[in-house]
Amino acid sequence: MANAERVITRVHSQRERLDATLVAQKNEVFALLSRVEAKGKGILQHHQIIAEFEAMPLETQKKLKGGAFFEFLRSAQEAIVLPPFVALAVRPRPGVWEYVRVNLHDLVVEELQASEYLQFKEELVDGIKNGNFTLELDFEPFNAAFPRPTLNKYIGDGVEFLNRHLSAKLFHDKESLHPLLKFLRLHSHEGKTLMLNNRIQNLNTLQHNLRKAEEYLMELKPETLYSEFEHKFQEIGLERGWGDTAERVLNMIRLLLDLLEAPDPCTLENFLGRIPMVFNVVILSPHGYFAQDNVLGYPDTGGQVVYILDQVRALETEMLQRIKQQGLNITPRILIITRLLPDAAGTTCGQRLEKVYGSQYCDILRVPFRTEKGIVRKWISRFEVWPYLETFTEDVAAEISKELQGKPDLIIGNYSDGNLVASLLAHKLGVTQCTIAHALEKTKYPDSDIYWKKLDEKYHFSCQFTADLIAMNHTDFIITSTFQEIAGSKDTVGQYESHRSFTLPGLYRVVHGIDVFDPKFNIVSPGADMSIYFAYTEEKRRLTAFHLEIEELLYSDVENEEHLCVLKDKKKPIIFTMARLDRVKNLSGLVEWYGKNTRLRELVNLVVVGGDRRKESQDNEEKAEMKKMYELIEEYKLNGQFRWISSQMNRVRNGELYRYICDTKGAFVQPALYEAFGLTVVEAMTCGLPTFATCNGGPAEIIVHGKSGFHIDPYHGDKAAESLADFFTKCKHDPSHWDQISLGGLERIQEKYTWQIYSQRLLTLTGVYGFWKHVSNLDRLESRRYLEMFYALKYRPLAQAVPLAHEE
């Protein structure tokens, strides 16, 4: 029998596949692309492209579904129409992009590079331009020699890939272990040596003395305190930091011996995660009203504040436990740096230092914005902070030095402004940097890059997108709450992924901004505060003292600045939502879906908590949404079935409010056009409230559709309303269905979304990235020089062009 020859199959490009399809299904493809072209000059998003397909005759749809073109179409994220051309950005899988352009006059297909596609896209705004030089940003050359995975399973698990690669590189022979020895010998805190002293000069001595220590420890009782053998260990070169008891020290020593003998990534991560490396943490969140009381619902003040306050308490608990278990007597410190607001609007935002409730060593440290004229007194929108941040960074550096009497071990940035300040500080101080986006505005506002000039006066996106690019490329590691935030899903583009290639016409063109396969990305999901948010079934913990206040909020016949409209039928289940009142949160969208759906209105009441009608808003977007809400109430005659409650700032009572909605057998709806994570989704599910949430962003990952909640498409509100009506109809006939979804949500939270899991992971990541930064070229010096130039030549002039706030 002849040996079968191995056949190598070449993967065809999108252009070749489209060429083949045009031969096989020429008429049908031409008909569809002609529909797209007929829309005229402009951009069609993925859902609009699919809508054009679904508007075709069923017979044509059927033919196309049977061929390769349909898969191509499903992968097309946008279409650029400049008749007779249609260009398509095709995404066969997360993080992988190809570009093609079709000439509909002669049905010629050409493949484009990212730069060519972006240049074509710019013609929508600037027309055809010849000879004009446009700055192109490309970070790819700096990463050419740096390893990165190609499999989707590694997206968001960068530390595992990094450990695999660098452990193989560093530990391939005994000589290559010297960087680890050097790291352990140099490791110290405030001048005090940790781990190893100068009695250990080489690897042979290290291994020999570790074995001696192992033999000695095996003779001791496991609970023997480190202090009882500290001097003996110092004589053989071992300092504090290995553990507080004989058992823990022995485990740590064995981990290192295993690494020296047969290194593997898992052992390496465990060892690095236990080295005492994090004692002082600085967290940056400049914008908004950052305080602990009476601020939620103020402009630019929402989930991020809650996230950080929960984060620092969990971090402190984990740091204290680790420091104790490492056998150290060091007091940790966590500083949340935000803006000091002299006009504090009845909050503590004018106070320099504020202790975080429920913590021992966490403080909010406020530093004012200032100009040459002095301190800026008033609140400033997050879209207008850019001209103040460089001076703010210098002032923050001085305040940190004063408070900590030294440098922090970790700097964490939050949102665009906090991440830029974190980048500047980390660069200045040489400290490990972590980035948390919370939300990247480019994703929230479709086409805000290509049409940035139209939006810049109001939003200053040119500054913000530039700051985002600088921060995400400067940072040591990025943590996200979900995979969606990084690389989206099969059908939706991730927040970070949308920064891979884009253009700001007339400013610069980003050919390669960020790669979702970069090992700096790690998914570390937060949770809800379990002392506030817990299941409605935990009767003994229920805060029934709030029930009279909650009933007043929901059912009072009084209409005032706190609650507008009344609920006539108090026995109906309640659809509940709570968020800031802005365009992207889409609360007015939910009200409109409800208003239009007669069946849903008969089944349930709607309660919306958002916006503050008790005072005049300073936020233009909130004003516009308020106006829309009033109009919807009148248009759909909602009074009697709808209640609009001003923002509620008491988190403890809000926790009981979720549980009270559970008692009505209601549901929580998160209708955002895009949501990076969805903390309110986690809060609602933690209380056992069945949840319907946007399919765009993090909630699509938090919720397992049909099991622990439901996904809804905010761009198809009619279908979302029908989905809600179907759920409540089913619950009416089978009450156990409500219980089933409620329990599914609770189980989902316990397995993945708790602050304890979060804090353990964050500290381990800090240790791992801090080590690799020390012993390898992970600090990416070349790209940081590139970023310095980009900051000075592009960001700074853009920031200086943003008008300063008018002070009366």
From Swiss-Prot:
Top EC category: transferase
Enzyme Commission numbers on file: 2.4.1.13
pH effects: Optimum pH is 6.0-7.0 for degradative reaction. Optimum pH is 7.0 for synthetic reaction. Optimum pH is 9.0-9.5 for synthetic reaction.
Tissue spec: Detected in the whole plant with highest expression in young rosette leaves and roots.
Keywords from the UniProt entry: Glycosyltransferase, Stress response, Transferase
Phenotype caused by lack of the gene: No visible phenotype.
Top-rank lineage group of the source organism: Eukaryota
Organism: Arabidopsis thaliana (Mouse-ear cress)
Protein name according to UniProt: Sucrose synthase 4
Chain intervals for the UniProt region annotation (GT-B glycosyltransferase): 277-754
PANTHER family hit by this protein: PTHR45839, SUCROSE SYNTHASE 4 (PTHR45839:SF27)
SUPFAM superfamilies linked: UDP-Glycosyltransferase/glycogen phosphorylase
Xref: Pfam families: Glycos_transf_1, GT-B_Sucrose_synth, SUS_EPBD, SUS_N
Gene: SUS4
Family: Belongs to the glycosyltransferase 1 family. Plant sucrose synthase subfamily.
Catalytic activity entry: an NDP-alpha-D-glucose + D-fructose = a ribonucleoside 5'-diphosphate + sucrose + H(+)
GO biological process: cellular response to hypoxia; response to hypoxia; sucrose metabolic process
Organism ancestry: Eukaryota, Viridiplantae, Streptophyta, Embryophyta, Tracheophyta
Keyword Glycosyltransferase recorded: yes
